From Swiss-Prot:
An individual GO BP term: CMP-keto-3-deoxy-D-manno-octulosonic acid biosynthetic process
The family this protein is said to belong to: Belongs to the KdsB family.
EC class (word): transferase
Name of the protein in question: 3-deoxy-manno-octulosonate cytidylyltransferase
GO molecular-function terms, A-Z: 3-deoxy-manno-octulosonate cytidylyltransferase activity
EC number assigned by the record: 2.7.7.38
Source species: Rickettsia felis (strain ATCC VR-1525 / URRWXCal2)
Lineage: Bacteria, Pseudomonadati, Pseudomonadota, Alphaproteobacteria, Rickettsiales
Chief location of this protein within or outside the cell: cytoplasm
Pathway noted in the entry: Nucleotide-sugar biosynthesis; CMP-3-deoxy-D-manno-octulosonate biosynthesis; CMP-3-deoxy-D-manno-octulosonate from 3-deoxy-D-manno-octulosonate and CTP: step 1/1; Bacterial outer membrane biogenesis; lipopolysaccharide biosynthesis
Catalytic activity: 3-deoxy-alpha-D-manno-oct-2-ulosonate + CTP = CMP-3-deoxy-beta-D-manno-octulosonate + diphosphate
Subcellular location: Cytoplasm
Keywords carried by this UniProt record: Cytoplasm, Lipopolysaccharide biosynthesis, Nucleotidyltransferase, Transferase
HAMAP family with a match to the protein in the record: KdsB (MF_00057)
Length: 246
């Protein structure tokens, strides 16, 4: 298998404020978390784990051959859960990069995961995250996050508002992060910052503390399931691709 020095961790917590028991919601006959895991597993990396506080989620993943790490339900964020899971990986001293894939993207493309790994390894950024070029209509449709970057693709700011103001094209931020090990360790040691709390975006903690985030372009915006409406969109998308035999 490729990238033996990389761990992919999918944090998945049973409790959810906007969509009850979100990881267990069905898309077709398959739970959300199983779909996410199967997509991620196509990247074919040995160190792929689901980090959870739930026996039910763990059993689902184990039945399809996945590896599970149990983490405390009191852990506040997905990034903290990712770090706690990383510390519990056997022989983790050989892992230098950690990819945090959110457990709510049932159609995430494995190629996007591999792209951020390659980009991270061939750059000097602390963290790398994918972005998609979109028009105004695409990002106005829901509470998406956009990012402003410099000429080299280094992130300058992330916002739930459309940035840069007045533009017609935007960079949609895909909620997936590739960390250098020392960057993840530093991130979880830092206290939440003013901008992070104002925008409700963890990644601003990174920028406010002088760390760097590189962006890499990917082709498609993955569906994220946070609400009942999102779930309906995911089910409809699944039904459409099923009709096409994809």
């Amino acid at each position: 298998m490729q990238h033996q020095d990389v761990a992919i961790i999918i944090p998945s917590r049973l409790s959810s404020t906007r969509l009850k028991q979100k990881p267990l919601q069905l898309i077709g006959s398959t739970t959300l978390i199983e779909r996410v895991f199967k997509q991620v597993n196509q990247a074919n990396l040995e160190h792929t784990y689901v980090a959870t506080d739930s026996e039910e989620i763990a059993n689902i993943i184990k039945k399809v051959g996945g590896k599970v790490i149990f983490t405390d339900s009191a852990i506040p964020t997905g990034t903290d859960r990712t770090y706690e899971a990383f510390k519990l990986i056997p022989n983790n001293q050989n892992i230098n990069y950690i990819v945090n894939v959110q457990g709510d993207m049932p159609f995430i493309e494995p190629s996007s995961i591999l792209k951020i790994i390659e980009y991270l390894k061939n750059s000097e950024y602390d963290i790398v995250t994918p972005v998609v070029k979109v028009d105004r209509e695409s990002v106005e449709a829901s509470s998406n996050v956009t990012v402003a970057v410099d000429s080299a693709g280094k992130a300058l700011y992330f916002s739930r508002s459309l940035i840069p103001n007045g533009a017609e094209k935007f960079l949609y931020h895909v909620g997936m992060y590739g960390f250098r090990k020392n960057a993840l360790e530093k991130f979880v040691s830092l206290k939440p910052t003013f901008l992070e709390k104002t925008e409700r975006l963890e990644q601003l903690r990174v920028l406010e503390n002088g760390m760097t985030i590189g962006t890499c372009l990917v082709e498609n915006v993955p569906i994220s399931v946070d609400t009942e409406d999102d779930l309906k969109k995911a089910v409809k998308f699944y039904e459409n691709i099923s009709k096409l035999g994809l």
